[in-house]
């Protein structure tokens, strides 16, 4: 009777070990397959965006000289990037996080003209020098998914 109990326990332990190995192998394969960054359904892109700009200009004494404004079309980055969290025996939290963000990969500087300029009393300026204001701004030329927190050069 003791031998049959030992045989049953040994078989039970053997099955448990095999089951654990199968589960571990399945988990490892699942993690390995999902660990690859899938770019197929990412939609990060450069899109035009209409914005309203207001720029104030002051004289050398710090007094408001003029306020200029205008509606301009500039590029923006928009879309979704794939991120994931997966179990990990290496990290302290027990999870490995891979976060990706849609952001600019290259910027360019543009010169724009604001064509509606007003003096401090709100009267539209008409003389050629004061009626318009040239400004510079940077906008994205291209956008892509970057690891969150990663600096763009």
Curated annotation (Swiss-Prot):
- Recite the UniProt keywords alphabetically: Disulfide bond, Hormone, Secreted, Signal
What does UniProt give as the signal peptide span? 1-35
Which GO biological process annotations does it have? G protein-coupled receptor signaling pathway
GO cellular-component terms in the record? bursicon neuropeptide hormone complex; extracellular region
Record-annotated CTCK domain positions: 44-139
Please name the GO terms that the record assigns under molecular function: G protein-coupled receptor binding; neuropeptide hormone activity
- Does Ribosomal protein show up as a keyword for this record? no
Report the subcellular localization.
Answer: Secreted
Question: Any idea what job this protein has?
Answer: Final heterodimeric neurohormone released at the end of the molting cycle, involved in the sclerotization (tanning) of the insect cuticle, melanization and wing spreading.
Quaternary state and partners of this protein? Heterodimer of burs and pburs.
* Protein name as annotated: Partner of bursicon
Q: Which gene encodes it?
A: pburs
